[in-house]
Swiss-Prot record:
The gene is prfC. PANTHER family: PEPTIDE CHAIN RELEASE FACTOR RF3 (PTHR43556:SF2). NCBIfam families: prfC, PRK00741.1, small_GTP. This is Peptide chain release factor 3. Signal peptide: none annotated. GO terms for cellular component: cytosol. Belongs to the TRAFAC class translation factor GTPase superfamily. Classic translation factor GTPase family. PrfC subfamily. GTP binds at residues 19-26, 87-91, 141-144. It is found in: Cytoplasm. Keywords: Cytoplasm, GTP-binding, Nucleotide-binding, Protein biosynthesis. Increases the formation of ribosomal termination complexes and stimulates activities of RF-1 and RF-2. It binds guanine nucleotides and has strong preference for UGA stop codons. It may interact directly with the ribosome. The stimulation of RF-1 and RF-2 is significantly reduced by GTP and GDP, but not by GMP. Pfam families: EF-G_D2, GTP_EFTU, RF3_C. PROSITE patterns: G_TR_1 (PS00301), G_TR_2 (PS51722). The keyword Protein biosynthesis applies.
Length: 523
């Protein structure tokens, strides 16, 4: 055991924030950056009209539309811990990026709108978190507005998601009548709007407010005490072992917009969340985070994070060992040696050169085309390969071509870089070599078209081809004559053949005609 390295690893907290769109995910990210001293003021959703955009929404289209379509990666120091926070897209069309991001974290923070409760995208993302077996912490947001009963919100976690919710604090009122938060662990109340000269926190004795405090004889506070009594009688008690096993979620209430309850949440989160742990490698081995040899995997590639430089960043989750500038690593996919001279991390929108990084850290590598999403990198003689990252089979397809044939170079450069990010997938018509894009949702095409024009000066024509089902075929079984008016024969960017069918009926027709041919949803 390398004790010095392990001490560094144990100070890391690497987590993703997940939610349904508009639940306040980006706002709580901003408030955490504010608490970490990375930014001086948080950009709110309202401020988007004035041009003060959220720090973690860096892409121009995100600023214009007020949505997150990429995963932002940010780091800061807080209470002696190194925080690596990944703000993920809430929009379902970009769930593939979110799923990959969840492979790179040790915990998740689930933000829920207290007026709406658990929404469809939250359910989908929670399912992935559960499959990964990582702990999830719940933040019931928007307490500054009227919402559902807190007892109902906690009960819904078990009813809908099948996870035990344990309240760590409890609201005293909500909306216009919000008075404060009862911190159950520390037996104190955090006041929502303390008067001038008044302490923000009021210590409680045996659950009772001291005489002369704003809570003394307050009917709303008395009602809260009754709810807590009910909760403690019927609910489960906090069990960190269950939390780490993904069987129980600590529940915090607050308002990200007014920065109420966020600090208490972050303080308790850094204490309760796990440090980086072991990772599976080579199919059946466990790699310890304090293993001496450096290793990691690339979970995200992003072009043009700095439009002035037109560069590409490959994001690496460090899994073991220690990164240092100039480190020589092997790219497992090719066996090629790569020297990591230029690595950065992100503090808000600023880039900071990385001199060292350990397990749990997220490092951005300047990429000239060496890396692909899912690549494993390692130093040392022992080959280390991490499990493949999840891939979605597209359900929407569009033919794409440049509007100006004189700008083929810009078109091909933009196409290649954006496809390598993994948000859209590229296919070529088997006969004509036409370009076809595949995506999970329509918004991905809109973002592709927008970025081609604004980042690569290449306007594109996009037309739907009306096919919805993609199925790969073994090249040994392929006969080009199988292509018909009911399907389209294409090849993916690695040259593998597949058929695009208009619908499930067309696929069944193909199976009936060629019963011995095996088609697969993924290669």
């Amino acid at each position: 055991m390398n004790k010095e390295l392990l001490d560094k690893v144990n100070k890391r907290r690497t987590f993703a924030i997940i939610s349904h769109p508009d639940a306040g995910k980006t706002t709580i990210t901003e408030q955490m950056l504010l608490l970490g001293g990375v930014i001086r003021s948080a950009g709110t959703v309202k401020a988007r009209k004035t041009g003060n955009y959220a720090t973690s929404d860096w892409m121009e289209i995100e600023k214009k539309r007020g949505i997150s379509v990429t995963s932002s990666v940010m780091q800061f120091e807080y209470q002696g811990k190194r925080i690596n926070i990944l703000d993920t897209p809430g929009h379902q069309d970009f769930s593939e990026d979110t799923y990959r991001t969840l492979m790179a974290v040790d915990a998740a923070v689930m933000v829920i709108d207290s007026a709406r409760g658990i929404e469809p995208q939250t359910k989908k993302l929670f399912k992935v978190v559960r499959q990964r077996g990582i702990p999830v912490f719940t933040f019931m947001n928007k307490l500054d507005r009227d919402g559902r009963e807190p007892l109902d919100l906690v009960a819904e976690l078990e009813e809908v998601l099948g996870i035990e919710g344990v309240a760590m604090n409890w609201p005293i009122g909500m909306g216009q009548s919000l008075l404060g938060l009862y911190d159950l662990a520390n037996q104190r109340v955090e006041l929502y709007h303390p008067e001038e000269g008044q302490d923000r926190f009021i210590a409680l004795a045996d659950g009772k407010a001291p005489a002369g405090s704003p809570l003394a004889d307050d009917p709303q506070f008395e009602e809260t005490l009754g709810e807590i009594e009910l909760l403690e009688g019927a609910g489960a008690s906090f069990d960190r072992a269950k939390v780490l096993a993904g069987q129980q979620t600590p529940v915090f209430f607050g308002s990200a917009l007014t920065n109420f309850g966020v600090e208490t949440f972050l303080e308790q989160f850094v204490d309760l969340a796990p440090a980086p742990g072991e990772h599976e490698v080579n199919g059946d081995e466990e790699l310890k985070p304090d293993d001496d040899e450096f290793s990691g995997f690339i979970f995200k590639i992003q072009a043009n994070m700095n439009p002035q430089h037109r560069d590409r960043i490959a994001f690496v989750r460090v899994c073991s060992g220690e990164f240092s500038k100039g480190l020589d690593v092997t790219l497992a996919r090719t066996g090629k040696q790569v020297r990591l001279n230029n690595a950065v991390e992100f503090e808000s929108s600023a880039r900071v050169q990385v001199s060292e990084a350990v397990a749990g850290d997220i490092v951005g590598l300047y990429d000239t085309g060496n890396f692909q999403i899912g690549d494993s990198v390692y130093a040392g003689k022992r080959k280390l390969e991490f499990p493949p990252l999840p891939e979605f089979t597209p359900e929407l397809f569009m033919r794409v071509s440049p509007k100006n044939v004189m700008k083929q170079k810009s078109f091909h450069k933009g196409m290649n870089q954006l496809v390598q990010e993994g948000a859209v997938q590229l296919y070529r018509n088997y006969q004509t070599d036409d370009y076809i894009l595949g995506a999970v949702g329509q918004l991905q095409f809109e973002v592709f078209q927008y970025r081609m024009k604004n980042e690569y000066n290449s306007e594109v024509e996009m037309t739907s081809i009306g096919h919805r089902v993609a199925r790969w075929i073994n090249p040994d079984q392929l006969d080009p004559k199988m292509s018909s008016s009911r399907n389209l024969l294409v090849k993916d960017r690695f040259g593998n053949p597949l058929f695009l069918f208009e619908n499930a009926f067309a696929e069944r027709w193909f199976h009936d005609k060629y019963p011995d041919v095996e088609l697969t949803e993924k290669l």
